[in-house]
Amino acid sequence: MQLVLAAKYIGAAIATIGLIGADDKTSNM
């Protein structure tokens, strides 16, 4: 249960960070 919530939360956070800091952090991967 917690894994699903954590995965969803982390996924949203990564998506937001990716959208916001796309230019700043190109070498995220």
UniProtKB/Swiss-Prot annotation:
CC annotations in GO: mitochondrial membrane; proton-transporting ATP synthase complex
Location relative to the cell: Mitochondrion membrane
Highest rank taxon of the organism: Eukaryota
Disulfide bonds: none
Keyword annotations: CF(0), Hydrogen ion transport, Ion transport, Lipid-binding, Membrane, Mitochondrion, Transmembrane, Transport
Gene Ontology MF: a single term: lipid binding
Chief location category: mitochondrion
Single GO biological process annotation from the record: proton transmembrane transport
Annotated family: Belongs to the ATPase C chain family.
Subunit structure: F-type ATPases have 2 components, CF(1) - the catalytic core - and CF(0) - the membrane proton channel. CF(1) has five subunits: alpha(3), beta(3), gamma(1), delta(1), epsilon(1). CF(0) has three main subunits: a, b and c.
Role noted for this protein: Mitochondrial membrane ATP synthase (F(1)F(0) ATP synthase or Complex V) produces ATP from ADP in the presence of a proton gradient across the membrane which is generated by electron transport complexes of the respiratory chain. F-type ATPases consist of two structural domains, F(1) - containing the extramembraneous catalytic core and F(0) - containing the membrane proton channel, linked together by a central stalk and a peripheral stalk. During catalysis, ATP synthesis in the catalytic domain of F(1) is coupled via a rotary mechanism of the central stalk subunits to proton translocation.
Protein name: ATP synthase subunit 9, mitochondrial
Organism name: Wickerhamomyces pijperi (Yeast)
